[in-house]
Each structure stands twice: as structure tokens, then as C-alpha cells.
Amino acid sequence: MFKKNINIKIKTKILNLRKKIEMWNNNYYVKNLSLVSDEKYDSTLFELNELEKKYSMFLNTSYSNKIVAKNICNKFKKIKHLSNMLSLESIFNYKNLLNFHEKVKKNLFYNEKRYYCCELKIDGLAINLIYKNGILDSASTRGDGLQGEDVTKNALEIKSIPHILKKNNLSFPKKIEIRGEVFIKLSTFNKINKMLKSKRKKLFSNARNMASGSLRQINPKITKNRSLSFYGYGIGYVNEKKYYYDQHDALKLINSWGIPIEKNTELCKSLNEVKNFYEKSIKIRDYLDFNIDGIVVKVNSMKLQKKLGCSSKYPRWAIAYKFSSEEKCTKILGVNFNVGRTGVITPVAKLKPVYFMGTIIKYSSLHNKDIIDKLGIMINDTVCLKKSGDVIPKISRVIFEKRKNVKEIIFPKTCIFCKSKIEFCLRKKNLYCTGGFLCYAQRKQLLNHFVSREALNIKGMGNKIISQLIEKKIIKYPSDIFKLNTDKIIFLKGMGLKSSENLIKEIIKSKTTELYRVIYGIGIPNVGIYTSMNLANYYKNISNFINTSYEDLRSIKGIGSFTSNCIKKFLKDKRNISIISDLLNVNLKIK
Ligand SMILES: [Zn+2]
């Protein structure tokens, strides 16, 4: 019974994953829309593959073809591939690579060399070119692996695809499939997007979408204007055995016929060399004029490739080893300074918008001066964004080789919001505005903090209400809240008679409160809820607290020198004392 339930669960899971992939594929291939980030897509597909491998009884064999069949758009004629054109299975770590290697090893012929042909995995779209006696006969997309869309007219507009192969000392085969990747150079991508922008047309979110949209065009003239590029990566079907070459030699062969190939390709003689190639690829990707999202590892021996064969979905002799912690590069256009509740000033880099992990990133926090110095960031620098956990990507490094016309990041001397003095906190390595409630940037957040659940706990007084009250200059300091009446709040957006009355009731209720709530609510830097309780417990009433000394504070268990300094400094400021006495003047009853 138990087992049966689990089976149903797994089956549902597999079906749901398939549905998701199908929906994404359909949007991606037919409408050129990426609904999810590449990483999300890859990891979902990986999860599905793993489940299907483990629970093969649920694997409906007609399925894999069925889902991709929908990926063919009706606007193109279909062309049948001479040999299947499967996509590659993706892996993400060295352990997966070892597994792949073990499987290959099991199938080794006696004294067969374990070489791998390693190539950069260009992020474009696959194309199948059929040459008959050296003349381009047809070009098609991958489609469902069995047949693709006829894009011959468009392929003829791609300069790097030869219409006629170059003669060498080997005669041309009667029929050969040459496979490769069509992509768009990043420099071209930027140029075209700039042009589209000037015409107020919709921009492409990434180079691959642009390449795909440009190749799969009814109008070949558009393909021509987009100046697509092409690299060959292998041979599919060929009618004569004498053209059966090992992968690395096959690349040399097609290159001698005038097919451009990517020049970083390496023949790796050990797994260690594959690993080195992978690491090298991560380093060079920033300098390439095209996007790569990993490397392709192919068993070099043709004989062994044939022996390994294919599963229902993937060839067993090749694998796509993807970059796991994806990096994206962009430029720092400037730096803004945000002021937080406690006055901390956070430098935020304004970035040249970049599509990353499924969203467009425009800003990235630089945290503090220390981090800026450590990374050596300057305005106009080209920087790399790196995925950090599941949250917002962070700037991980500067590409110093690309440094040009840089400017130093200069921190303001006075607060840009309230002109108060800016001080440096040595321990936290950050700058903060000393304005407190006087600072417009801090006021809203301080007041929100003051009414929050653990502080004065005024129910119904949310951010929206506070923002309006501040904008209308009805409140400025905490004590102003207790001077509110229904007449002053009934006109606010989202308020009615009933809700106004309720809010006033809540405000009145909160006037009888506890000491720790007030200490916490006035927002002393570095004083959280537990420290506030600790202090309230010790001082018993507000005037004892106001008149305390540093030594007295230090004598309290759990309060260190840093916190003591923060409190003492806060209490030294007359403005803060008047905020507290104003609260007492509006009859705040502190228990
Ligand atoms: Zn300020």
C-alpha cells in the first residue's frame, strides 16, 4: 500500500515535470519566448531525466518524440534528417562527468584510446546542412531530432555557411550532413538591439533568442540583415565509409572544405585534461564575442561512438558539461547611495541592464566601502555578476583587462537626503547619516519601525498610511502619531470612516505600552528586540535609561562595548532626547 502511494506520487511528479518542460519548449521554439532561466530549465530537465532513469516503468517511449514534435512551427516546410539529430544530455558537476566516463570505459574495445574531443558549447541553435557533391542542398533546424524546419533560404544569407564546399585532395561525398551552431556575435547583438531601441521596437532579451528569431524567418532578407554566424561541429550522415573520421579529424576535414570551426577545440587524452579544458573555458568566456554555456565532451573515436549508440533521447557518446555557477558580465554606469532605517548608507551600483537568471538586473548592492576596495570596483568598470545561493546575484569581480575611462566611487560627505553629517562606523565598516528622524530617507523607515508589531504594535498603520502621512506633512516624529484623529486620516487613500475609527482606536490602545517597546521603537542603532528587553528589565523606567552612563551600560550582562557606545551616542544627541520627551508629552503611558 505504502509503495503504491509512492509510485503514484512519483508518476505525478514525472508527469508534472514533463508538462512544464513541454510548455517551456513550446514557448521557446515556436514563439521564441524564454519563460524560465536557462539554469532553471536545465535543472528541471535534469531532475526529470534522473527520475525517468530511476523509474523507467513510467517512461512512455513515444513521449520524448511527442513533446518535441510540437516544437516545430507550421510556417516552415519540414525536412527529414538523414540521421537522427539528438540534443545532448546536460551535466553540471565533475561527479556527473565521472559517471559518464565510467559508462564509456565499460564499452571500450581492447586497446581503444580513451580520448575526448572537447568543444565550447555555443549558445545558439543547431542547424543541419546537407551538401550533395559539395553543393549546399538544404538546411534545417533540429526540430524533433527526426525532422526539422526548412531554413535553406535563410541559411544562404549566412556568410559563413559556404554554398559550395572548397576543394581539397579528397573528392566530395555524394551526400553528407554537416552539423553546426548558428549564433549571433555579442557585438552584433548589441548593435541590433541599439538599432531596435532607436526605432522603439521590442528588444531581444538575449543573443540566442535573436539568433533563433533571425534564422527562423519567413523573410530571408531579415536573416541577412541580422548577420548571423556559424561554426560547424560535426558530421551526421555520410554516404561513404571513407569519410568516417574520428571527431577531432572530422572537424579538420570539414574545415578544409571551408566550413568554419571554433578554434578552442581540444583533443583531451585524459579526464584531467577534460577538467582543465572546462576550467579554461570558464576563464575565456568573458573575452569571447559569443555566449557559451558550457563545454561539449565527445568520445573521439568514431568506432566507439557507434558502439555506444543512443538512448531514446540522447547520444551516449557525448555530453554537455554546463557551467554551474553562471556568471554574467556588465558595466557599472554609476553608484547611488541608499539610506536605511538606522542611517546606514549603502552604495548601490547602477548597472547596464543585463538578462541574468531569468530577470533583467539593473542594480546591485556594493554593501560598503570595504567591499568596493577589496574588489577594486570603479565607475565604468566591466564586472561579473555571479549567482549567490538562490538570491539576487552579486558582483564577484572586476575584469581589469577591460578597464577604460574609469572614475573613482566617491562617498558623499553629508547625507544627500538631509545634509546631516555622515560618520564612519569602524566596526561595521559602513557610513551612516546622523540625521535620524530629521532625515527624510530614514523617517519613513523609522516610523514604520516605531509602529511595528514588536515596537508600539499599532495595527492597521502600514507603510502605505505612513508614506501618505509623511508626504502630506501630517507626521514627522513618533509623537505626531498620537496627535492624529479621524479627520486627519479619513481622506487618505484606502481609508474610510470605519477603518479610520479603528485605526484611531488602535493608536489610543498603543498609548499604554511597555518600556522595552519604546526603547526598541525609537530605533537606536544596533539595539534589537532582545537588547531592548534586557535594558527595560534593568532600568525599569525611561528616565533611568535616558540618564545612564557608559559604565552602567557595560555592567549589564549581554551588553558589549559596541552596543553601549551606540546607546550612549544616541542619548547624547539632544534631538533624540526631545523625541522621547515629546512622546511623554502626548501622555504615552509606559508600564
Ligand atoms: Zn540623512
Swiss-Prot record:
Q: Which PROSITE patterns does the entry link to? A: DNA_LIGASE_N1 (PS01055), DNA_LIGASE_N2 (PS01056)
**SUPFAM superfamilies xrefs:** DNA ligase/mRNA capping enzyme, catalytic domain, Nucleic acid-binding proteins, RuvA domain 2-like
- Stated EC number for the protein is 6.5.1.2
- One Pfam entry name: HHH_5
Q: Which UniProt keywords apply?
A: DNA damage, DNA repair, DNA replication, Ligase, Magnesium, Manganese, Metal-binding, NAD, Zinc
Residues that hold NAD(+) according to the record:
D38, E39, K40, Y41, D42, S87, L88, E119, R142, E181, K298, K322
Q: Which InterPro entries match?
A: DisA/LigA_HHH (IPR041663), DNA_ligase (IPR001679), DNA_ligase_AS (IPR018239), DNA_ligase_CS (IPR033136), DNAligase_adenylation (IPR013839), DNAligase_N (IPR013840), NA-bd_OB-fold (IPR012340), NAD_DNA_ligase_OB (IPR004150)
As cofactor, the record names: Mg(2+); Mn(2+)
Q: Which GO terms describe its biological process?
A: DNA repair; DNA replication
Q: Which domain of life is it from?
A: Bacteria
Chemical reaction(s) catalysed: NAD(+) + (deoxyribonucleotide)n-3'-hydroxyl + 5'-phospho-(deoxyribonucleotide)m = (deoxyribonucleotide)n+m + AMP + beta-nicotinamide D-nucleotide
Q: Which residues bind Zn(2+)?
A: C415, C418, C433, C439
UniProt-recorded Gene Ontology molecular function terms:
DNA ligase (NAD+) activity; metal ion binding
Query: Which residues are responsible for catalysis?
Result: K121 (n6-amp-lysine intermediate)
Functionally, this protein is described as follows: DNA ligase that catalyzes the formation of phosphodiester linkages between 5'-phosphoryl and 3'-hydroxyl groups in double-stranded DNA using NAD as a coenzyme and as the energy source for the reaction. It is essential for DNA replication and repair of damaged DNA.
Q: What does the similarity note say? A: Belongs to the NAD-dependent DNA ligase family. LigA subfamily.
Q: What is this protein called?
A: DNA ligase
Q: Which organism is it from?
A: Wigglesworthia glossinidia brevipalpis
